[in-house]
Amino acid sequence: MGGESRYQIKIPSNQINIKNYYCSNSYSNPTLATPSLNPYFVTGFSDAEASFIILILKEPKNKTNWTVKTRFSIGLHKKDTLILELIKSYFGGVGTISPQNKESVQYRVGSLKDLNDKIIPHFDKYPLISKKQADFILFKKIINLMNHKEHLTLEGLQKILAIKGSLNLGLSDEIKTNFPNIRSMERPLVARPKINEIYPNWISGFTSGEGCFHVRIKNSTKSKLGVQVSLLFKITQQERDK
């Protein structure tokens, strides 16, 4: 009877691409300066793992009875906390890293100032190339409304809800019940990137988030050793980004 074993290897956190374009383990030496990530690595990793989140929550103390919260976040397994620390360092130390549960940690940037000063300028200069770029565009529109205090008025809140309707999972059932006349804004179209627009460091960052290296071992009568070894590199994505 034939048998098969599979081994899946995710890229370890100590093999990330730093600014000098080399993979390095040297940062583990506490006497050395912390390396800085290449900007395109950060964008590639964000295309794979980041989320642009808008939360609309009940808040009776506000004139609109609602509050708007913003968040840029990246969640990873706790063994990869180092990557989040390097990303936080890249963004000038803004945001927090905290446990989500026993096995995962999350990097969050929530303040408008930090989003305006660090997060948005980065993705304006080094844009996302997956369909997540549409989420960023919508997120940025909401941030701009909040910069002008429009989230504090009912009219402004309704504008935000129309945008959020096309962001991530859209509007919650609670929001739809309270704002039944909101019509979601059309989701921005993101052009397919040209090959020469995909930089090596973006590929490195994206692969660090989504890439897997598989080793498959199965019994084989054609091999002198009685087994056959196959190697596979794989990147998995949602249908919209294939």
Question: What do the predicted segments below correspond to?
Answer:
Residues 1-242:
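Sequence-level preference for short, compositionally simple segments enriched
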